[in-house]
């Protein structure tokens, strides 16, 4: 069985967010998918299986800890690889069926790689935190809040607590404790700290062990929140930054359409192509 290593939200190879893509994982069990993700040590891996409809694939995304119902950069990276393997012409369109959501992705060849853009649909705006609760979350990251803006839970498939912090607060941020229960209590799965003026953000897994380089599932909520706050207009693309503090600067292109759908896109570079030696049956 073959798999590929790609870089997403990357203007060149060895930048952006790395990803392992298995283009035909039809014979793998969920247990094998989870174990392979742990073996490869990527923040996320994506496993595809072709469906009967043209350019349609089932997709399952795993972190080293669990399966996710939705993710951003794995979807874009997978679509770019599908274009490389099956697209042929300069432009293509794909439909990925995740466990709880279907996502349409447009891809095109660009420079030495690909550009992929997905429609995440409309954002769902959740709980707005009061001052005390927002301060508690900021303290959990040893960060300083930007009190000009509200902290709010927003989702385009995964619910994020969007926590505005100062520029210095973003640079100094370090998650000090597990936030699983605290986030669940407000209807969020992750926290995303953002320097509003710089359009830059950071996020960690709920345990605070691993910082993500570029988070497409957070980019949609951030874009929708910014438009709702009047910081950016609808129907006008803009870029978000992430990964600088990990030495992997990444650009995430976003746009909220007049209808309210959120588009998230970025460049994808193919890095490596490999083959598993055990058979799927040997992997369990």
Stretch-by-stretch model annotation:
Residues 1-70, 76-284:
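Active-site proximal loop and beta-alpha junction motif in alpha/beta enzyme cores
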